[in-house]
Swiss-Prot record:
GO terms for molecular function: ATP binding; proton-transporting ATP synthase activity, rotational mechanism. InterPro entries: ATP_synth_F1_ATPase_gsu, ATP_synth_F1_gsu, ATP_synth_F1_gsu_CS. F-type ATPases have 2 components, CF(1) - the catalytic core - and CF(0) - the membrane proton channel. CF(1) has five subunits: alpha(3), beta(3), gamma(1), delta(1), epsilon(1). CF(0) has three main subunits: a, b and c. Keywords: ATP synthesis, Cell inner membrane, Cell membrane, CF(1), Hydrogen ion transport, Ion transport, Membrane, Transport. PROSITE patterns: ATPASE_GAMMA (PS00153). This is ATP synthase gamma chain. Produces ATP from ADP in the presence of a proton gradient across the membrane. The gamma chain is believed to be important in regulating ATPase activity and the flow of protons through the CF(0) complex. It is a peripheral membrane protein.
């Protein structure tokens, strides 16, 4: 049985851990609010940009290689977004298992599946399984910015336009709430703007767009806007992943703090029982010694 000194040391150690987990929870909560604001602020712009592209494409019958589906998909690039750090529950393992399941179920039917990892946890997981990445980006939590997303997007776009891949998919945690993240796989390229819906709207609407004069040409406008749209989608996925990471870490640290509190209560109860037993034993020894002296 542990001594009073050992139990006292365990209580102090658990209290120190509790302080750390509580602080991490507060930090994650602050970062989560910032990430949520990024997501909320970009949505109106993203929707407006998507509508403008679709309107121009439908009314002027303009297309672009980024929008054209390949007849047969043989080469796929899988962009996997995880975190650099742990202590966020099953956040990373869920993404890695999802991506691994996709790889195992499609590697026989596809000629090539390449991986681009954003976040160290995904890279390390697949590296242990002998799968190498075509690119590997870390420090997502610290350097999350539109510039970083643009860098990733341009790398992916260039590979796609050069014909290296027929399809680009991204696996990430879609942010629902602080306690809910859903692993999602989206097709990034070719870009799907829901052209059927926009065409119906264009057919029933006025013909103002048809009579507009574009400068530069619609083809050039579509090119610039599609690239901006793609960069924005990559940034959105990164932002949702970061928000999900902070939400998962906040939840995990809250559970850890509560568990530490329960452990402290149990250890304190055990400490008090042992101390009471020790005091009782000492009193019995004193009384027994006094009785022996009387006798």
């Amino acid at each position: 049985m542990a001594s009073l000194k050992d139990i006292r040391a365990q209580i102090e150690s658990t209290k120190n851990t509790q302080q750390i987990t509580k602080a991490m929870k507060l930090v994650s909560a602050a970062k989560l609010r910032k990430a949520q604001n990024n997501i909320v602020n970009m949505r109106p712009y993203a929707l407006a940009l998507r509508q403008v592209i679709a309107d121009i494409a439908v009314t002027n019958k303009v297309s672009h290689p980024l929008m054209e589906k390949k007849e047969q998909v043989k080469n796929v690039l899988l962009v996997v977004i995880t975190s650099d750090r742990g202590l966020c529950g099953a956040f990373n393992s869920n993404i890695n298992k999802f991506a691994e399941a996709y790889y195992n179920s499609n590697k026989a039917s596809l000629e090539k599946i390449d991986f681009l990892f954003v976040g160290r946890r995904g890279h390390d997981y697949f590296a242990r399984r002998g799968i190498k990445a075509v690119d590997y980006i870390t420090k997502l939590d610290k350097d999350i910015s539109y510039e970083l997303a643009s860098k990733v997007a341009n790398r992916v776009m260039n590979d796609y336009l050069e014909g290296s891949y027929d399809e680009v998919r991204i696996v990430h945690n879609e942010f629902k709430s602080a306690i809910s993240q859903v692993v999602t796989a989206e097709t990034l390229l070719p870009i799907d703007l829901g052209m059927t819906t926009f065409k119906k709207e264009a057919d029933t609407a006025s013909n103002f767009a048809v009579d507009m004069i574009f400068e530069p040409a619609p083809e050039q406008i579509i090119k610039e806007l599609l690239e901006k749209h793609f960069e924005l989608q990559v940034y959105r996925c990164m932002s949702e992943s970061v928000a999900g990471e902070h939400g998962a870490r906040m939840s995990a640290m809250e559970n850890a703090t509560n568990n530490a509190k329960e452990m402290i209560n149990k250890l304190t109860l055990t400490y008090n029982k042992l101390r009471q037993e020790k005091i009782t034993t000492e009193l019995i020894e004193i009384v027994s010694g006094a009785e022996a002296l009387k006798g």
